[in-house]
A protein has these predicted regions:
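Soluble catalytic domains of membrane acyltransferases
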Residues: 26-205, 217
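Mature, function-bearing regions of proteins
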Residues: 208-212
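N-terminal membrane-anchoring alpha-helices
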Residues: 1-30, 214-216
Length: 217
């Protein structure tokens, strides 16, 4: 297990921390690389090809006692994953169940922020306004914005990093080696398209849960 630098936002969890470290060991998952010793950054994870990415990702966050804010599709906060799509509404995927209200409370307390994909206008602007007033934060985003294969990244991570003047840190979700590989931090120095090409070259060939990462602009 890697060490967490002193500037990183942390939240000590007496039960969930040790339990998550135990579960990662049982599942034979590891966390490699180094977290930059910075008080503000955006972690971007890929390839995001299955809902179990989120499960292992949550275990990693809890195992390291990180205090994070993560953005996820609104339906994952109240519904259960399903292999069959019952609705064309992107905010109503999955299967509703009686404890959806409790699921939402738990995920929000862990740092989750629901993103309504049908009407997501203003989400990034609101986030920029919120975090510009904070001294430390750790943001988590899946730039593919879903588990399906997409032709390009969503631009949210780019504008967060650019407007907040913070680095973004690529994290490989590597199912072949059962590891979250933390790469070197990157600063926004060019257009969204150019930054995307840079990140694509980092993630290219990484084996996710159901597919190998590939993307052609």
């Amino acid at each position: 297990m890697i060490k967490v630098p002193e500037k990183i936002p942390k939240k000590k969890r007496i039960i969930l921390g040790p339990l998550s470290r135990f579960l990662l060991k049982i599942f034979k998952w590891d966390i490699t690389g180094e977290i930059p010793n910075l008080s503000k950054m955006v972690l971007i994870g890929a390839p995001h090809s299955a809902m179990r990415d989120g499960w292992y990702g949550l275990l990693a966050v809890l195992a390291l006692d990180l205090k994070v804010t993560f953005y996820g599709a609104s339906w994952i906060f109240t519904r259960l994953p399903s292999l069959i799509t019952f609705s064309k509404n992107l905010d109503k995927l999955g299967i509703p169940w009686p404890l959806g209200w409790l699921q939402k409370i738990i995920l929000i307390r862990l740092g989750g922020v629901p993103v309504y994909r049908v009407n997501s206008r203003g989400t990034i602007k609101a986030a920029i306004e919120k975090f510009s007033r904070m001294d430390n934060y750790l943001l988590l985003i899946a730039p593919e914005a879903g588990t399906e294969l997409v032709p390009k990244f969503r631009s949210g991570f780019y504008y967060l990093a650019k407007e907040l003047n913070i680095p973004y840190v690529p994290v490989e979700i590597d199912f072949k080696n059962r590891a979250f590989n933390i790469r070197s931090p990157e600063n926004v120095t060019s257009s969204f398209e150019e930054e995307s090409k840079k990140i694509i070259s980092i993630f290219e060939g990484v084996e996710g849960a159901t597919r190998v990462f590939t993307m052609s602009e």
